[in-house]
Amino acid sequence: SLEFFSVEIAKYFEKIGHKIFWYNLFLSENSFEELLDYYNFHKKDEFVALTFNFEGLEGEAGLYQSDKALDGLHNEHTSRWNFWDYSGIKVINIVVDHPLYYHKYLADRPHNYVQIDIDRIHIDYMKRFYPDVRTYFIPSAGTEVNKDKRAYKEDVYMPVKDRPMDIIFTGNYTPKHILRKRIDNMEQDYIDFYENVLEVLTAHPHMTIDEVGEKHLREEFLDITDSQLLDCMPTMMYVDLNVRFHYRQLAIRALVDAGLKVHTYGEGYNYIECQHPENIIQHGSANSQQCLDKISQAKISLNVMPWFKDGAHDREINSCLNGAVSLTDSSRYLDEIFTDDENILFYDLNMLRDYEASGYNPEVTEPMVRRIKELLQDNDRLQQIADNAYMICRDTHCWDNVAEELADIL
């Protein structure tokens, strides 16, 4: 996905006259030599590095070297030589996960570093724990498959009535027993602590990982400082991943056990616990382009937010740009740009929580299921919702829009 996003942004920058140097992280040492030659030859030009999720900022060979100190230049945060501080190039890093995932890389960040976050709660986290980092909120975007009319010539996208799939979900699923390996080597007291945090967050899905994590840490350690709190946050990855996959399973289970078929593109759906696994139509792994192609052939695209409470995920924007109606839980940001039943279908995570607590009583999810079944019988209404969503997203939520905002930061 990150490579796909990069290509989309690069298209815009090339279109407005910028030259693009692609750095190959799979051949980092060779690519570094090419980069160094290119940089030395074009030193008078202005360079900006653009990356996602700290790729190229993780100590990769070539870009980071412990036995070399050109010009004797060192990062204020590290004693290793690195190309970014040697060159002084501005590095813009788009972080599409919670910053707690990248604690160690933030501590070793380049001197001329700018971070883009896609959730305003992540911005608050950065301002609190990394106040010296320049941070900007730019919401996630999507890609319109048929923008050039190559996929479907008759219209902007395939009409709802002609789409072969009722419901699609793109993305992977990882069950708890696999995620548990992240903390199994800890002492039992620590395991119990993180399991308790997970239990509380699962029971209160409106809360953020920041809120629940800090609450429990302060209850456990009364005098904990912000610095100590920050050091404890990375292990909350276990909680964050678990809660998102837990609700992903609940959403899919609620639909398939009600007789709806859900087409999945991604790994791990054989682990979903439900009464009617035959209604999960597993297509296996798929890359970003394949996922987009399949979304453009589905009537409804299911989404479960990766615990973004004030941001968006590319999955719902991709759905809107490709003619599928997005069925998703909400966030404060999504509430600002979408209206339920007009250009999107919202469901409530509290409903899924109560569904599980009831022993998976179908009466709990019946209003959502009935709504979906009725809409699947009403192609005109689904088409209207899809068209309304497309009109919202086509001019303001594409990667060109992200690139325009990045250009202002350059």
Language-model regions: role of each:
Residues 1-129, 146-156, 283-284, 288-290, ...:
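Extended catalytic core of nucleotide-activated donor transferases of GT-like folds
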Residues 1-17, 21-28, 108-110, 120, ...:
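Catalytic binding pocket for nucleotide-activated donors in carbohydrate/polymer assembly enzymes
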Residues 45, 88, 259-260, 299, ...:
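Residue-level detector of structured alpha->beta connecting loops
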Residues 55-64, 173-176, 345-354:
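Short regulatory "switch" loops immediately downstream of catalytic or recognition motifs
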Residues 67-73, 189, 194, 352-364:
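Intrinsically disordered, low-complexity Ser/Thr- and acidic-rich flexible linkers and loops
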